[in-house]
Amino acid sequence: MGKGVGRDKYEPAAVSEHGDKKGKKAKKERDMDELKKEVSMDDHKLSLDELHRKYGTDLSRGLTPARAAEILARDGPNALTPPPTTPEWVKFCRQLFGGFSMLLWIGAILCFLAYGIRSATEEEPPNDDLYLGVVLSAVVIITGCFSYYQEAKSSKIMESFKNMVPQQALVIRNGEKMSINAEDVVVGDLVEVKGGDRIPADLRIISANGCKVDNSSLTGESEPQTRSPDFTNENPLETRNIAFFSTNCVEGTARGIVVYTGDRTVMGRIATLASGLEGGQTPIAEEIEHFIHLITGVAVFLGVSFFILSLILEYTWLEAVIFLIGIIVANVPEGLLATVTVCLTLTAKRMARKNCLVKNLEAVETLGSTSTICSDKTGTLTQNRMTVAHMWFDNQIHEADTTENQSGVSFDKTSATWFALSRIAGLCNRAVFQANQENLPILKRAVAGDASESALLKCIEVCCGSVMEMREKYSKIVEIPFNSTNKYQLSIHKNPNASEPKHLLVMKGAPERILDRCSSILLHGKEQPLDEELKDAFQNAYLELGGLGERVLGFCHLLLPDEQFPEGFQFDTDDVNFPVDNLCFVGLISMIDPPRAAVPDAVGKCRSAGIKVIMVTGDHPITAKAIAKGVGIISEGNETVEDIAARLNIPVNQVNPRDAKACVVHGSDLKDMTSEELDDILRYHTEIVFARTSPQQKLIIVEGCQRQGAIVAVTGDGVNDSPALKKADIGVAMGIVGSDVSKQAADMILLDDNFASIVTGVEEGRLIFDNLKKSIAYTLTSNIPEITPFLIFIIANIPLPLGTVTILCIDLGTDMVPAISLAYEQAESDIMKRQPRNPKTDKLVNERLISMAYGQIGMIQALGGFFTYFVILAENGFLPFHLLGIRETWDDRWVNDVEDSYGQQWTYEQRKIVEFTCHTAFFVSIVVVQWADLVICKTRRNSVFQQGMKNKILIFGLFEETALAAFLSYCPGMGAALRMYPLKPTWWFCAFPYSLLIFVYDEVRKLIIRRRPGGWVEKETYY
């Protein structure tokens, strides 16, 4: 950094602004790189004395108000800096002048220019150019407003962070407790928090009483985490003695010293990182840009060629400029901007019905071109509720039902041991169902209590009936709640069973701790001594369930003998007067947050669609790997390096990493990797799980995938996911459990939090890309029959065959509904069985599409139009050869005696009525040939007969364009308004043969493509 400072200091005053900007940019990049690094702090390692010395805080009395005021003046308020927001007017201007709109604006300006030139040089200039300019401007403004309305979402990332900032904080200053505004909390303050509070800043805990915090928005762990003064982990995000700004304290109380405030907190760093990241251009925006380059190239090439040609043909400079402008404007597809916007909007609406809410229209297509999905685990791939998965009793493992609708397997519930186990699980449990939920299915009911206990409660309620009744029957006398030192929970109950002693002691906790307190074990309802063999059996079961990524709890009980503990005995939990050893071990119950039902199928679909699914989670590697196997992210038979090492019984470092298709990467390993090593992992492993990752690492993984050229979708729900969501090509947030911040950073929100909805989105995205190609091919084709009349008018000097107003009637009238109807077309083949498109080679509009639309189908259409034009003029006495070179006298308003081929004389007014009738007929001919074009654009490879005519909107479009053409031709008063005149019915049929020719020509072309895949015809004409 010294270099930058030095330069600014010693350079002369005339330093260029460019240099300054460059410096700012470099500094921003350095800052961003700094934020991407892991959190480095050592406050969690300091002893209380060192903490006191570092912050100068009295650990019981806190800071003095004067010292706090000094620090506040030095550090500024404890608040997040809002990012620079884009003003709404700038966003509106982007919609008005971005991409496609620019092309139309240039067209409009050229029209006004041409009108200006004509007004200055002619006495009575025609108003066509003026109309065209006004219409083009109107089209841009209307579609711009429409797009702006669709995307009227501002960058509210920071506003949602603001909602996370607690308003009040309880601090101790000079020994007095006071509630102050959270913004006034300073580094070194002594702060007290209790259950229900938000943590006001990053705190180093110095004393705690049963304190648990919910870190899920930060680390993605769904279980509340215990907080205590003990230093338990090198990693500050994992140690118990740091509580983070804006996480929630769920139970207990704690005191801590503030170590970071505002932007310097861990959450503040994530916020700054998320708002500072630049999301790149969406793939569809790049495609539209590419398309504009193509069209502009064609327009300018034609314009300049004919400009030179008209000078060679001895037109004046002014006329040549008017022609140049006319040709460029005629090449602009006026209706296409509206068509693309409407097609994307329709798809967005369709996706919303399928639970995918798209915030940004262009993101609709991005999902279709996705090649890698980085998915969060908790709540996206899994159900986000702990569920009992297995039990071990009677020396065997039993499987519980983890399906969402309880349609899975059941186990033997007749064993006496199961009765004892379910009794302990129901009684030694503080979770309760919330009130008034009797009508809801058990699994859907809300529970007050921690995740593991509510899983047990629901399991017992499903298997054994009402737990409330069981608890009333066995009333509780005393209890010792779970704590982190003894790692068990114990309660003593009255036993109503006459055949057993009067008191029942039940205990649950960490399996190894519970086993240590037992001397016997219950097998098939009979108590037996716990020998080594049974201990081994326990150990194997414990390892097996733990290896499945499940959380295992052990359960034991003891029937307290009546002679020692008669009825009314006073149990004392402080000075324990009852046995807590030599108990009877009953069994294990293991829990997992199980996969959602639809996920394995969705992952399979992604795989067949060529999309790589990577799991990125903050959870433990074992759990992550188990879920990855459960949902098919690691498919059957694919091994990780560890699996291969275990199978061959060799150390892990002797296995060649390339032999393993699957790979589980721990966050701590990722921390020390270079970007080249990460690239290697992403390149050579097809199935990857990243576990125990931090927010910054999620971002690094996304950037790694993008370096490989992948188009990356990221799913996430926590604040921790927001930088990755913002950086990804498409960020997908969760609608139900997602934090506001993640929803703001994302481009799309899954309303049902289900990974399977993403697959629906991919399908819709691929379909709209295919259908947009069809819409564009359809729209561009009519450009040729619109341009050629003008070109022939210049070269052959004939009366103008088609006027500007009629061109507008096609582009903004008859072609609109049919072009949009193609968005409703069904897929030709299974789009989910092909690889993602390659953004470099598979373009929305390529040279082949242009050559088909302009060079082939468009030419046939133009022939149809000219045929009609010559037929009408011939019927009125002007034979084709007589027309050559007649233009100057024809357009001269003072000449009233132009002779036709039969010697009849025509006044100026009469000639113009015939000319405008020709314009109308040419327009109707284009509508007739566009019928065939619409039908052939339904498919790109299949025959139309295979595809069928199921698209009702398209059939409506055919009728609509015909009805509109008839209305414009026959409506009284159109002659004065749009200069369109009624046609003889026979003139409608002139273009029919050409329409049929287009249909036959294209069916033959597609037949050859299907018969000879990869052949010359496919290479040249398949778009």
Curated annotation (Swiss-Prot):
Binding site for Mg(2+): 717, 721
Pfam family, one: Cation_ATPase
Subcellular location: Cell membrane; Basolateral cell membrane; Cell membrane, Sarcolemma; Cell projection, Axon
EC number: 7.2.2.13
PTM remark: Phosphorylation on Tyr-10 modulates pumping activity. Phosphorylation of Ser-943 by PKA modulates the response of ATP1A1 to PKC. Dephosphorylation by protein phosphatase 2A (PP2A) following increases in intracellular sodium, leading to increase catalytic activity.
Segments of this protein annotated with the region Mediates interaction with SCN7A: 596-717
Any one biological process term the GO annotation gives: negative regulation of heart contraction
Keyword Zinc: no
Residues with the Phosphoserine modification: 16, 40, 47, 228, 452, 484, 668, 675, 943
Keywords linked to the UniProt accession: Acetylation, ATP-binding, Cell membrane, Cell projection, Ion transport, Magnesium, Membrane, Metal-binding, Nucleotide-binding, Phosphoprotein, Potassium, Potassium transport, Sodium, Sodium transport, Sodium/potassium transport, Translocase, Transmembrane, Transmembrane helix, Transport
One GO location term (cellular component): basolateral plasma membrane
Entry membrane topology: Multi-pass membrane protein
InterPro entries according to UniProt: ATPase_P-typ_cation-transptr_C, ATPase_P-typ_cation-transptr_N, ATPase_P-typ_cyto_dom_N, ATPase_P-typ_P_site, ATPase_P-typ_TM_dom_sf, ATPase_P-typ_transduc_dom_A_sf, Cation_transp_ATPase_P-type, HAD-like_sf
Binding site for ATP: 487
Annotated TM spans: 97-117, 130-150, 292-312, 320-340, 776-798, 802-824, 850-872, 916-936, 953-973, 980-1000
PTM annotation (N6-succinyllysine): residues: 661
Origin: domain of life: Eukaryota
Propeptide: 1-5
Cytoplasmic side stretches: 6-96, 151-291, 341-775, 825-849, 937-952, 1001-1023
Subunit description: The sodium/potassium-transporting ATPase is composed of a catalytic alpha subunit, an auxiliary non-catalytic beta subunit and an additional regulatory subunit. Interacts with regulatory subunit FXYD1. Interacts with regulatory subunit FXYD3. Interacts with SIK1. Interacts with SLC35G1 and STIM1. Interacts with CLN3; this interaction regulates the sodium/potassium-transporting ATPase complex localization at the plasma membrane.
Entry-linked NCBIfam families: ATPase-IIC_X-K, ATPase_P-type
Name of the protein in question: Sodium/potassium-transporting ATPase subunit alpha-1
Species whose genome carries this gene: Mus musculus (Mouse)
Highest classification ranks of the organism: Eukaryota, Metazoa, Chordata, Craniata, Vertebrata
Gene transcribed to yield this protein: Atp1a1
